[in-house]
Curated annotation (Swiss-Prot):
Membrane-crossing segments per the record: none
Protein's recorded name: Histidinol-phosphate aminotransferase
InterPro entries: Aminotransferase_I/II_large (IPR004839), HisP_aminotrans (IPR005861), PyrdxlP-dep_Trfase (IPR015424), PyrdxlP-dep_Trfase_major (IPR015421), PyrdxlP-dep_Trfase_small (IPR015422)
The protein's required cofactors: pyridoxal 5'-phosphate
Subunit structure, interactors included: Homodimer.
Lineage of the species this protein comes from: Bacteria, Pseudomonadati, Pseudomonadota, Gammaproteobacteria, Oceanospirillales
Highest taxon of the lineage: Bacteria
Modified positions (N6-(pyridoxal phosphate)lysine) in chain numbering: K219
CDD domains hit by this protein: AAT_like (cd00609)
The protein's annotated pathway: Amino-acid biosynthesis; L-histidine biosynthesis; L-histidine from 5-phospho-alpha-D-ribose 1-diphosphate: step 7/9
Similarity comment: family membership: Belongs to the class-II pyridoxal-phosphate-dependent aminotransferase family. Histidinol-phosphate aminotransferase subfamily.
NCBIfam families per UniProt: hisC
Catalysed reactions listed for this entry: L-histidinol phosphate + 2-oxoglutarate = 3-(imidazol-4-yl)-2-oxopropyl phosphate + L-glutamate
Length: 363
């Protein structure tokens, strides 16, 4: 039997039908496709980080509970006393932990669409059913349709990204409360972009018995560390910890995260600068003919172009700027591109590349 035949026989058909998550090559390009913080660590923080990493006991397994981080985060986020936390190797691992513990074959994971692609991908990985409820044309939640879907499918897990990725907007609180009240299982509020908005749902973990909140340090400047966080009632965290792999946060990441928390005001300054750049960039994009700009509460801006989006994307790449092509990913994203908010210099270069690309495609 050939390798191909064995794969056809033994790899689950739904996995064979998938494509591996693609990360574009950004070599030599201004990278504005992945919502990363463009600013480097301050020199003094880098020096301190170097010492902390040097002192890490890499010959030993790391603290399995990352206890020092737990203490630091409880103070940083003013976590309710009744709440606990769980850490993952990025938010992706936390989504996987949630799905493994709560969903599975014969159960349903529900989210709105378009939203973060990993909700659907991980549902497929674990053999759960996935239900995606389309957003309205303005990318707000269709409350009645969503509530009807919850009633019909009785999802074990509901994921809501707030602000939403890739659209960048916030959903209104009243609709979210209706979803929480109607959901029979666990509702996960994904606050990956919380640093760029005033919205905060941490109090909901004590207000509701079926809500957990997910956050990450990736968007504030620590994407390379892959550190995700989940906050919820102690009883939920106790169950979820049973499927978390031991020692999943390595000692270098633990030391680096502690260093970052000690200097968190520096990262707050950077996120404030990016929020200012977002406002400036949105205003500039509003003046570009043929471009529709959508409101954003994240560190990226969704735009729709009146030309073939793939051609505009390719022309921008040819001009040295890499953005995210969303056209083709979901019917409601036809003609759409996602632009990460970078430094002022990067944003100026992106605007220049966009103008040139539009002119080239328009002919």
């Amino acid at each position: 039997m050939s390798v191909k035949d064995r794969i056809l026989q033994w790899v689950r058909p739904e996995v064979q039908a998938l494509s591996a998550y693609h990360v574009a090559d950004a070599s030599g390009l201004i990278k504005l496709d992945a919502m990363e913080n463009p600013f480097d660590f301050p020199a003094a923080l880098k020096a301190e980080l170097g010492v902390d990493l040097r002192d890490a006991a890499i010959n030993r397994y790391p603290d399995p509970d990352a206890g020092a981080i737990r203490t630091a985060l409880r103070e940083l986020y003013s976590l309710p006393a009744s709440a606990d936390m769980l850490f993952g190797n990025g938010s992706d691992e936390i989504i996987q932990i949630l799905a493994m513990a709560v969903a599975g074959p014969g159960r349903t994971i529900l989210s709105v669409e378009p939203s973060f692609v990993m909700y659907k991908m991980i549902a497929t990985f674990i053999g759960a059913e996935y239900v995606g409820v389309p957003l309205n044309d303005d990318f707000q939640i269709d409350a009645q349709t969503t509530l009807d879907a919850i009633k019909r499918h009785q999802p074990a897990l509901v994921f809501i990204a707030q602000p939403n990725n890739p659209t960048g907007n916030l959903f209104d609180d009243e609709t979210l409360r209706q979803i929480v009240a109607a959901s029979p299982g666990l509702v996960v509020i994904d606050e990956a972009y919380t640093a760029f908005t005033n919205a905060d749902y941490m109090s909901w973990v004590s207000e509701y018995d079926n809500v957990v909140v997910m956050r990450t340090f990736s968007k504030v400047g620590l994407a390379g560390l892959r550190f995700g966080m989940l906050f919820g009632a102690q009883e939920w965290i106790e169950q979820l910890n049973k499927v978390r792999l031991p020692y999943n946060i390595n000692c270098l990441t633990q030391n680096a995260v502690l260093t970052a928390i000690r200097h968190f005001p520096e990262f707050v300054k950077q996120t404030e600068a990016l929020r200012e750049q977002r406002s400036w960039l949105s205003a500039q994009l509003d003046g570009v003919a043929g471009v529709t700009v959508y409101p954003s509460e994240a560190n990226f801006i969704l735009v729709r172009v009146d030309l073939p989006a793939k051609s505009v994307f390719s022309e921008m790449k040819r001009r040295g700027v890499l953005i995210k092509l969303l056209d083709g990913g979901h019917p409601k994203l036809a003609g759409c591109l996602r632009l990460t908010v970078g430094s002022h210099e990067e944003n100026e270069a992106m605007l220049k590349a966009l103008s040139g690309a539009l002119a080239a495609v328009r002919g």
